[in-house]
């Protein structure tokens, strides 16, 4: 057997590929367009193809040359909430339409398992905290809507073609496996990496977007999870499907929420740096609070996160940033 990782040259995807190669139990095939990913981030023992999953002839070639692929892990999607508000059609074209084209080729080639990188953004402003897998999904931005549409498309493809799927709904992803070759870099938009860039002196200050949320300190609250733990969850989800289980979704998070100001203070403690901060207006499409209940993943999949507190997650990312002050970029 073999696993195809879509988007395997990106931040989370490269952790996934490293984990698969580390286990050494099956062949690992990677597809990435390198629009946001880095070729050098792909483990040398993985088979790499550069291309777009929406190119069906290209994907047919990948499956034809790797007939032992029976499962796909899908990370290849645009994922910036703010950008999705400005360019919604870009997200529906790449994310949602891309899923249709992928599933058509998977069905044609007889590949029947897919583990999908979904998002907490499908819940929008959640009706309950912590968020359960059964919490109503009402996205408030095109990014979340595009991912929810992808989940719906997979549901009907399962019924029609028997392609079994597991959407893994991530909450905030942060940190770095010290053995991996990539953390978030290049035009960074995520809170923790920017905070650490300020600690390094790469940036002058961190902007805290919004101080009027319905939270104790006025900044929005998020649940954080380490990419190493996400990689383990993906492996468990593939095993779950291969055992003949039915399609189902899982939330992946630490089940503990931290506000932006709490993350800032924790980073100051871990790094020993002042980290200047300035408050700014809210970004459109950001909910007040997103905290997961990952009890289902822990019970059904046997998922056991190793990075179970925010300071540990920050410390792992800071170790990488400290040793790579200019970040990581193979584009010259």
Curated annotation (Swiss-Prot):
InterPro entries: Epimerase_deHydtase, NAD(P)-bd_dom_sf, UDP_G4E
GO BP terms: galactose catabolic process via UDP-galactose, Leloir pathway
Keywords associated with the record: Carbohydrate metabolism, Galactose metabolism, Isomerase, NAD
Top-level class of the enzyme under EC nomenclature: isomerase
EC number(s) given by UniProt: 5.1.3.2
Catalytic residues as annotated in Swiss-Prot or TrEMBL: 143
Gene3D superfamilies from the UniProt entry: NAD(P)-binding Rossmann-like Domain, UDP-galactose 4-epimerase, domain 1
Record-listed substrate binding positions: 119, 143, 172, 190-191, 207-209, 222, 283-286
Cofactors (names): NAD(+)
UniProt keyword Metal-binding, yes or no: no
GO molecular function, one term: UDP-glucose 4-epimerase activity
Signal peptide: none
Disulfide bonds: none
Pathway named in the protein's UniProt entry: Carbohydrate metabolism; galactose metabolism
Binding-site positions, NAD(+): 11-12, 32-37, 52-53, 75-79, 94, 119, 143, 147, 171
Catalytic activity field: UDP-alpha-D-glucose = UDP-alpha-D-galactose
Subunit and interaction comment: Homodimer.
Family: Belongs to the NAD(P)-dependent epimerase/dehydratase family.
Functional summary from the UniProt entry: Involved in the metabolism of galactose. Catalyzes the conversion of UDP-galactose (UDP-Gal) to UDP-glucose (UDP-Glc) through a mechanism involving the transient reduction of NAD.
Name by which UniProt lists this protein: UDP-glucose 4-epimerase
Organism: Streptococcus thermophilus
């Amino acid at each position: 057997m073999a696993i195809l990782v879509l988007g395997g040259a990106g931040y989370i995807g490269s952790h996934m590929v490293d984990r698969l190669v580390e286990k050494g139990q099956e062949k690992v095939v990677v597809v990435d367009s390198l629009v946001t990913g880095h070729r050098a981030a792909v483990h040398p023992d993985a088979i790499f193809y550069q291309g777009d999953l929406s190119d069906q002839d290209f994907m047919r070639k990948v499956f034809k040359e790797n007939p032992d692929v029976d499962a796909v892990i899908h990370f290849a999607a645009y994922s910036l909430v703010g950008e999705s508000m400005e360019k919604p059609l870009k997200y529906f074209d790449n994310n949602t339409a891309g899923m249709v084209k992928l599933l058509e080729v998977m069905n044609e080639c007889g590949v029947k398992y897919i583990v999908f990188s979904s998002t907490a953004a499908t819940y929008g402003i959640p009706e309950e905290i912590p968020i359960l897998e059964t919490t109503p999904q009402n996205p408030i931005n095109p990014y979340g809507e595009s991912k929810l549409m992808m989940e719906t498309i997979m549901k009907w493809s399962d019924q029609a073609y028997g392609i079994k799927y597991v959407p893994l709904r991530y909450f905030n992803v942060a940190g770095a496996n010290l053995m991996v070759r990539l953390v978030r870099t290049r035009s960074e938009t995520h809170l923790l990496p920017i905070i650490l860039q300020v600690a390094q002196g790469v940036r002058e200050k961190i902007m805290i977007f919004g101080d009027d949320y319905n939270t104790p300190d006025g900044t929005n609250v998020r649940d954080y999870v380490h990419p190493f733990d996400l990689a383990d969850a993906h492996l468990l989800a593939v095993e779950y499907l291969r055992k003949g289980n039915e399609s189902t979704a899982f939330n992946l998070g630490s089940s503990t929420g931290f506000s932006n100001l709490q993350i800032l203070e924790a980073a100051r403690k871990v790094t020993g740096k002042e980290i200047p901060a300035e408050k700014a207006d809210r970004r459109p499409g950001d909910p007040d609070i997103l905290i997961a209940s990952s009890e289902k993943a822990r019970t059904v999949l046997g998922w056991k996160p190793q990075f179970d507190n925010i300071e540990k997650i920050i410390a792992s990312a800071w170790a990488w940033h400290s040793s790579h002050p200019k970040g990581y970029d193979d584009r010259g």
